[in-house]
Design a protein with these regions (language model features):
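Conserved micro-motifs of the catalytic ATP-binding
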Residues: 2-5, 67
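A residue-level detector for a conserved hydrophobic packing site
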Residues: 10-11
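Short beta-strand/loop element within the Bergerat-fold HATPase_c
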Residues: 28-39
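Acidic ATP/Mg2+-coordinating residue in the GHKL
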Residues: 47
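Short conserved segment of the HATPase_c
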Residues: 52-63
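Short alpha-helical Gxxx[C/S/T] motif in the catalytic ATP-binding
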Residues: 75, 79
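Detector for a conserved hydrophobic position within an alpha-helical segment of the HATPase_c
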Residues: 83-84
Length: 107
């Protein structure tokens, strides 16, 4: 598995996702990678913190949208732009009482 990407920018995505998980009270964060169809590289970042409210799930990638009192609301929007710049995607796969899972897909 090989991804050609800007290391600093991709690191920023992981920093944003891990920071959000910790702010949500996560005790466990799992990062896994696999090959997808057509040689896509898929990375999933899962945590057991408080779920993202259903009412917010469609808006979390909008710049300056936040559900936190102290949040700026730019972390996930920056992460989405970084993925777009790398011809990839980031999406929220699920967020419920058991787990919140984000998926990064590199094409």
């Amino acid at each position: 598995m090989m991804i050609y990407a800007d290391e600093g920018q991709i690191s920023q995505i992981f920093i944003n996702l891990i920071k959000n998980a910790l702010q949500a009270g996560a005790r466990h964060i799992d990062i896994s990678a696999k090959m997808g169809k057509e040689d896509d590289v898929i990375i999933q970042v899962a945590n057991d913190g408080e779920p993202i409210p259903v009412s917010a799930q469609e808006q979390i990638f909008i710049p300056f949208y936040t559900t936190k009192k102290e949040g700026s609301g730019i972390g996930l929007s920056i992460s989405r732009q970084i993925m777009r710049n790398h011809n990839g995607t980031i999406e929220l796969l699920r967020s419920d009482a058991q787990q919140t899972v984000f998926e990064l897909r590199f094409r």
